């Protein structure tokens, strides 16, 4: 390189040195793609069982019935909520309560 500015004549590319390392890649390889129906994994159907839940009203203690379809985990979670955190209200007691706890 002579001078302060670089010119293309100052660079010499030796592509023959890279030839052994660089190999062409066949883009049409022997890999087979699965069919579309095999490509999408179907989620297993969730097994839900119908249940009748009987719980007392949180105010007047009258028996209330609700019917749900739930998984084993879901029905156990509902049971824990009804025992510890949640109280159902009958229609009569609902009218006497203020919504939102205020």
UniProtKB/Swiss-Prot annotation:
It holds the Pfam family E7. Keywords: Activator, DNA-binding, Early protein, G1/S host cell cycle checkpoint dysregulation by virus, Host cytoplasm, Host nucleus, Host-virus interaction, Inhibition of host innate immune response by virus, Inhibition of host interferon signaling pathway by virus, Interferon antiviral system evasion, Metal-binding, Modulation of host cell cycle by virus, Oncogene, Transcription, Transcription regulation, Viral immunoevasion, Zinc, Zinc-finger. Homodimer. Homooligomer. Interacts with host RB1; this interaction induces dissociation of RB1-E2F1 complex thereby disrupting RB1 activity. Interacts with host EP300; this interaction represses EP300 transcriptional activity. Interacts with protein E2; this interaction inhibits E7 oncogenic activity. Interacts with host TMEM173/STING; this interaction impairs the ability of TMEM173/STING to sense cytosolic DNA and promote the production of type I interferon (IFN-alpha and IFN-beta). It comes from Human papillomavirus 25. Highly phosphorylated. Transmembrane segments: none annotated. This is Protein E7. GO terms for molecular function: DNA binding; DNA-binding transcription factor activity; protein domain specific binding; zinc ion binding.
